[in-house]
Every structure is written in C-alpha cells, then in structure tokens.
Regions:
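Conserved AMP-binding/adenylate-forming
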Residues: 19, 43-47, 63-110, 221, ...
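Conserved adenylate-forming
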Residues: 65-70, 162-172, 177-219, 231, ...
Length: 543
C-alpha cells in the first residue's frame, strides 16, 4: 500500500464517531411499508405472521432482553432448530443491542459449553430439545435469563410496548458472532458489526435476489444458525416472506409439494438438496412450469453433470456463490446467465464465479505479493462484507488478516475475465516427494466416475515419499452379494487408471479405500481431519 501524501489536507483526517443504524431498523421500515403482508410462515408450529406482527414481536423480545439485563454488546446465545420464533429471536436480539450467537443446534452439550465459554452469554434463547444443555450451562455458573422457543414474548401489531426499547447502537457495535465450522479446531466467532451486517444484507439483496418482493416466497431449507439465517434476514428489503420447510428434513418427496404449495420463488441450499430438487421435479413438466426464480447454492462443489441436469430440468434459475463464515459467503457469484456456459480450466475444474458487488479478490504468493491473472496463490478478500475479526483470538486475527486482507486459506487463481478458479485449500495440501499436492483436483476427477458418490483425498505419512495420497470413496450404490470384494477391487483399479490418465504421476493416490458412509462434521462438511487421522494410524510421522 502506498504512503499517505504529506502535503494533502487529508493526511491526518480521522472520521468522526457516529451513531450507527441498528440492522433491526430494516424490519421496521418494511413493517411500515407493507404491514399486512406475510413475513413468516411456519406451519409445523402453527405460526403465520405479518411484517407488522414480526416487528411487534421483535420489539417485545428486545424489551424482555433489556429488562433481563442485556446491555449493548452483550451476547445472547441462540440454540434451536428452525422455528418461527428463531426468526423473531434474530430481530429481537438485534433490536436490543445485543449480539446474536447462534451455534449449530446439532452440536453436543460439551461443544455448546465450549462455545458458551468463548462468548460469555448474558442470556440464552433455546428450544426444549436443549434443556439438558441449559441445565449444564447453569451448572457452570450461568445466572442470566433463559427464554424458551415456543414461549417467547408476544405483542399485537401496533401495540405500544410497556417497556421502552433503546435500540441505538454505534456502527461498530458487534451484532452477530458467525461461528466457523471448526473443521480444523474449535469454532471461532467471526464478529460482524451493525455496519458489516448491513453491508452483507444489502450485498445479498443486490446479487442473489435483486427482484424479489412481497409477491414472492423464500423457502428455508437449512439451519438458520448459519448462511440460511443471513438469507432469511436479507428478504426484508423486498418484503418477501420466509417459509420454513414443513415436515422435517427436505427430501425428494417433500420438496416439490412445498415449492408448489407455497409458490416459492427463491431458496438457499447446498448442492445435495439442489440435486434432490432436480431429481424430484415432476415428470412431464418443463423448465417454465414452476415458480422458482433463484435457487442459490453454496457450501460445497457441485459436479458439472449435476449442474447440467438441474439446468435442463429447472431452467436458468441457478445461482452459485463461494465464501466463508468470515465473509458470510459473500466472495463470488456465478449468475444464472453464467450457468450453461460455465468457464472450465485446463484441468476440467469449473469456476465459482466473479467477485460479489463491492468485494475485491486478490491472489497472493507466500510472501503476500499480489499475483497476476492466471497465477495460482492464496485467495484473499477485501471489502465491507469482511468481518471485523475473531472474538478473543489475537493469533488467528494476525494470521488471517495479515496485510489488511482476509486470507481465506483457499488456493486458486483469477482468469483474465475475473472468474475465480479454486484448486484446493492450503490446510488440505500435502507434500509427496517434494511436490505440493492439492486434493481438490484429484477429488473432482474421481467424482466424474458415476459409481463414486463422494471422494476425499488425504495425505498420510510415508517413509519413502514423506506423504502419499489416500483416496476414501463412498460408492453411489454399495455392492451386495459374494462378489462385493471383487467389485470394489475392479472399481479401485478403474479409478487408479482414471487418475493416471488425467494427473501427474505424483498426484495419483497410492491407496483407495471404500466406506459405507462418509463421516461429516456437525455442520455437514466432510470430516477430512477425522479421515486423515484414521488412515495415518500406524504409519509413523512424515517429517
């Protein structure tokens, strides 16, 4: 970065402190504009609220939190499966001036206690399924108020609250702790201020669902504790209602009745669920015979063949984005017009899109020097959607935000048109015979075989090469009968030949193992760390 001019009148300029806009003000604006339009539908729990009713409920909860002792910047831990009152909780915590801390509800009691120790909650909102956790938290000395999902404070739309709510905040007051997946250690709390979260939501509106309004409907398919929560909050600008998927986990059988029944126009999901949406699309219907305008997917790579099938059945409604918790996913976007003409590099890897609005992507080498188009390095990001840092993790902050950029840990390159291609993660890389190997390239090649459902390649210690690659495969269909071992051997031989034909020799996995089900983390990500530990046992140390 260049030095500041010493002759400029702005050389010593310091911005004046100013009051921020509480993100919950967006809700009030929409409630004033379209008070009687639907905002939330949760038919499993018998809840349907208008925007005015949601605003009143947020006000009532904020008043209860402040009465219970929650001050500005105090943490409110929110632990619950999806429910209309989780949506009320998000808006109510924001309005109170507290900080939303929503860990994955699938975490164990011990894991939740670890997160609680990290963020020191002043209050807890939980569903009854987490009563044991609340008891355990109290045993550690927690004495703050507890609010139960299903029994949160209510208020009639337009009613004057009995307790006045002070929702004023500084623009740099934290308002959301967005937990990382913790796949390489305990989750970190990426901290978003009201200024950051406002920018994130406006970015989502601008890039992901720019034309949505109160006549549409957004289907909630994933836990609101992570990216789906951001997607839900972003619907406020258009006044689009959030419909919580009824009947439990989304399946091929339940998705289309929900999409058709509610007239869904947008949804945020992962490739696995998008594949179910495409697979379950009723036969005899064409791409124009549904209401979907934007199906937004992220969280994992999607095979080109799966993309092609979804495009063929659903038409040009797919939107892909890439990002991490520290940027709430807001790094790249692959728009509908890019799908079907998706740029592919020489290794057959597809792009994850161009930079999101207001975001700059920078590729750097090991020394932090910016690299030109076409050269591979670490993917770094700058922009208003990048979090303020990790709560209480100075070492992680120094590493991840070195040089003023957020270092994603992903490896890739930009082409001349600004498309980003990811080739791996720094943490996944292993060194075999002195050469760096990034598993992603190998995994994407293995996934082109129709008998492979999932593939993970990990580096394990080897006395000759330092490390070797081990491929762990979950088959699309497990073989049965007496010849199942032979079928596995045949597939392993075919996959080895596939790798030899498409990769440099040092990248070809030395071993291939099959598992019935691939292990995943509580956040649904493939458990690489667990697989690496399992297949490294008894092999000694690589270095």
């Amino acid at each position: 970065m260049r030095a500041i001019s010493q002759t400029s009148p702005a050389r010593d300029f310091t911005p004046t402190p100013r009051r921020g806009v509480n993100v919950s003000h967006f809700l009030t604006q929409t409630a004033r504009r379209i008070p009687d339009r639907l905002a939330v539908v949760d038919d499993d729990h018998g809840q349907r609220w208008t925007w005015a009713e949601l605003d009143a409920r947020a006000e009532a909860l904020a008043a209860a939190l402040q009465t219970g002792g929650v001050d500005r910047r105090d943490t409110v831990l929110l632990v619950s499966a999806n429910h209309a009152e989780v949506i009320q909780s998000f808006w109510g915590i924001l309005r109170s001036g507290g900080v939303i801390a929503p860990p994955n509800a699938a975490l164990s009691t011990e894991e939740l206690l670890g997160i609680s120790a990290e963020v020191a909650p002043a209050a807890v909102i939980a569903d009854r399924a987490h009563a044991d956790f609340v008891t355990a938290l109290k045993d550690t000395g927690f004495t703050g108020p507890v609010f139960w999902i299903g029994d949160l404070p209510t208020a009639q739309a337009g009613a004057v609250p009995t307790e006045a709510v002070d929702s004023t905040v500084d623009e740099d007051d934290p308002c959301w702790y967005f937990f990382t997946s913790g796949s390489t250690g305990r989750p970190k709390a990426a901290t978003f201020t009201h200024r950051h979260l406002g920018a994130v939501l406006m970015n989502h509106r601008c890039d992901l669902f720019p034309n949505e309004d109160e006549t549409g409907a957004s289907l909630v398919l994933a836990p609101l504790s992570h990216g789906a929560g951001i997607h839900m909050l972003g619907q406020v600008f258009g006044g689009t209602p959030s419909i919580i998927h009824p009947g439990g986990k989304p399946s091929v059988e339940t998705l289309w009745p929900a999409i058709d029944g509610y007239g869904i126009t947008n949804a945020f999901t992962v490739p696995t669920i998008l594949n179910r949406i495409a697979a379950g699309y009723p036969s005899g219907r064409g791409p124009e015979d549904h209401t979907l305008e934007r199906v937004i997917y992220a969280g994992a790579p999607m095979l080109a063949a799966d993309q092609a099938r979804a495009l063929d059945r659903l038409g040009p409604c797919l939107v892909q984005y890439f990002g991490l918790a520290e940027v709430t996913g807001a790094i790249t976007i692959l728009r509908p017009e890019d799908h079907g003409t998706i740029p592919v590099d020489d290794a057959g890897i597809g792009t994850c899109g161009r930079a999101r609005t207001g975001v700059e992507i920078v590729i750097v080498d090991e020394g932090g020097t910016q690299l030109p188009a076409g050269e591979q390095g670490e993917v770094c990001v700058a922009g208003p959607t990048v979090c303020a840092g990790y709560l209480g993790r100075p070492d992680a902050n120094a590493e991840s935000f070195a040089g003023g950029l957020f270092h994603t840990g992903d490896v890739g390159y930009l082409d001349e048109r600004g498309y980003l291609f990811l080739t791996g993660r720094k943490s996944d890389m292993y060194i075999s015979g002195g050469s760096n190997v990034y598993p992603r390239e190998i995994e994407e090649l293995l996934l082109t075989d129709t008998e492979v459902a999932q593939a993970v390649v990990v580096g394990v210690p080897d006395p000759q090469w330092g490390e070797i690659g081990v491929a762990v495969i979950e088959r699309a269909q497990s073989p049965t009968g007496a010849d199942s071992d032979g079928a596995g051997a045949d597939l392993a031989e075919r996959l080895t030949a596939l790798c030899k034909s498409g990769l440099a020799k040092y990248k070809v996995p030395k071993e291939i193992h099959f598992v019935d089900t691939m292990p995943v983390t509580a956040y649904g990500k493939l458990a690489r760390k667990e697989l690496k530990a399992e297949y490294s046992q008894g092999r000694g140390s690589a270095r």
